[in-house]
């Protein structure tokens, strides 16, 4: 089988069309590329125009309630297409499909429901759909990693791509729905990962991001020879060795699992980007225990100190939840003081959203009033804005190597791209193309951007 026959979407006006909308995490973006690969092999072509689609798919997220509410709103929009054109198929795939299962089929809202481990069955499910017989497959697998399927890349710039190195999660944090929607943790054969990264580099890609719910627990066990087992640090090294011109990123790390070996490997290879996304969720050890995060405040701060001692220029970003069950004002203050201590580059910040079926939904009341959650979240957001600015100000005067991603949104005469530490730089164009590397000098900053000059 030729794994890499079509790395970009096929353009063919004669093929039936599939339209894919993706919600949620980077893993879902990569899953949509796997889905497209499977459907392209069945004779379909991707379209960006919903009006011409024969199949409309939403690849969904369940991490918070508002993510699901958005999809319910979109289903109403999709059904307009169904009324306009007979034979249009509407499918919900991904985590919301896994969580809600047959509820999505009630009232004939959609024709197709497929969970994250059921994408290989999509062609058969589509063939079996009739007006009276919608199709569903939400079986979770202990083996499926889609390792033999080459994703068809849907990115717009042709230089940055995602590679899924594992699926599922074994951590079962009390607030999180992911283990129930994506199943148990499975690591992918490292040789297929390296081959995929090599193929991307051969096709002009300059950056790959290795994806997993918890990349640090990646572990490939060789069935015959234990000396051929591969952990995450070893996998990182294998991908980094493809070429010094290929940047390697990864996400997401877990504070309890990020090892000294991973940090040391990053230090050895310059093309492994100096950025770690390390979700803290709360600065309170009491809350962390209740969340089942399996580390405390001191452990987290020690890991940050270790990263900075080995990689002083490493960007660190995080996730923070405001208003988890039973969170006191002191717990909230603990989060704020931890943020001030670490000075994160940026953060994803959310008010706690109780998810049905999780341990927290069964064990802990969602007892922080909406107004209080909102107040705490707004304090966290305001503080992070100041911390982002403080972090960026340390970059002033530095020279950074940047990968050009495209024109600046605000000024088409300027370019933008990220430095190794994941900070976004804006700088004057000097005729560079997307995918070129260039060195810039940081002259001034905002909380979100480094404004840079060019080296003459």
Question: Where are the regions that the model predicts?
Answer:
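Glycine-centered loop/turn positions within well-structured domains
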Residues: 120, 171, 216, 285-286, ...
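Conserved, mostly hydrophobic/aromatic
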Residues: 173, 193, 210, 250, ...
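Proteins enriched for Cys/Gly/acidic motifs involved in redox and nucleic-acid/cofactor modification
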Residues: 1-219, 231, 261, 276, ...
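Conserved SAM/AdoMet-binding glycine-rich loop
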Residues: 90-94, 202-330, 340
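Alpha-helix N-cap/loop-to-helix initiation residues
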Residues: 28, 64-67, 97, 255, ...
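Short flexible coil/turn linkers enriched for glycine and charged/polar residues
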Residues: 155-159, 169-171, 272, 282, ...
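Terminal RNA-binding accessory module
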Residues: 5, 360-456
């Amino acid at each position: 089988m030729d794994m890499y026959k079509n790395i970009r979407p096929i353009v063919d006006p004669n093929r039936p069309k599939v339209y894919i909308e993706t919600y949620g995490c980077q893993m879902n973006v990569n899953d949509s590329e796997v889905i497209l690969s499977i459907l392209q092999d069945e004779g379909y072509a991707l379209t960006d125009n919903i009006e011409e689609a024969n199949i409309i798919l939403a690849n969904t997220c369940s991490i918070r309630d508002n993510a699901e509410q958005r999809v319910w709103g979109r289903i109403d929009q999709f059904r307009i297409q169904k009324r306009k054109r007979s034979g249009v198929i509407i499918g919900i795939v991904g985590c919301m499909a896994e969580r809600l299962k047959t509820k999505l089929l009630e009232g004939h809202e959609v024709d197709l429901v497929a969970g994250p481990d059921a994408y290989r069955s999509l062609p058969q499910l589509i063939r079996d759909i009739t007006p009276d017989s919608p199709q569903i497959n939400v079986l979770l697998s202990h083996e499926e990693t889609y390792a033999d399927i080459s994703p068809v890349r849907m990115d717009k710039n042709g230089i940055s791509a995602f590679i899924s190195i594992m699926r599922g999660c074994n951590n079962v944090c009390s607030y999180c729905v992911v283990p129930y929607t994506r199943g148990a943790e499975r690591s992918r054969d490292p040789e297929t990962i390296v081959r995929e990264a090599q193929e991307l580099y051969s096709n002009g890609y300059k950056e790959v991001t290795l994806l997993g719910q918890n990349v640090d627990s990646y572990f490939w066990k060789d069935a015959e020879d234990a000396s051929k087992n591969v952990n995450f640090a070893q996998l990182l090294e294998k991908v980094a060795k493809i070429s010094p011109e290929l940047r390697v990123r990864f996400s997401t790390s877990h504070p309890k699992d990020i090892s000294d070996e991973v940090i040391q490997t990053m230090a050895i290879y310059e093309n492994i980007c100096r950025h770690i996304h390390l979700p803290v969720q709360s600065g309170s050890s009491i809350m962390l225990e209740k969340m089942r995060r399996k580390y405390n405040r001191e452990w987290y701060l020690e890991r940050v100190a270790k990263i900075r001692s080995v990689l002083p220029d490493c960007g660190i970003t995080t996730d923070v939840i405001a208003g988890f069950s039973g969170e006191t004002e002191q717990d909230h203050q603990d989060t704020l003081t931890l943020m001030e201590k670490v000075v994160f580059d940026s953060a994803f910040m959310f008010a706690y959203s109780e998810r049905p079926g999780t341990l927290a939904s069964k064990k802990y009341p969602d007892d922080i009033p909406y107004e209080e959650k909102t107040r705490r979240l707004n304090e966290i957001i305001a503080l992070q804005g100041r911390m982002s600015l403080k972090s960026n100000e340390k970059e002033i005067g530095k020279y950074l190597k940047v990968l050009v991603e495209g024109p600046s949104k605000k000024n088409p005469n300027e370019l933008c791209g990220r430095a190794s530490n994941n900070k976004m730089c804006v700088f004057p164009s000097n005729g560079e193309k997307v995918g070129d590397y260039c060195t810039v000098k940081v002259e001034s900053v905002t909380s979100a951007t480094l404004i840079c000059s060019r080296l003459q």
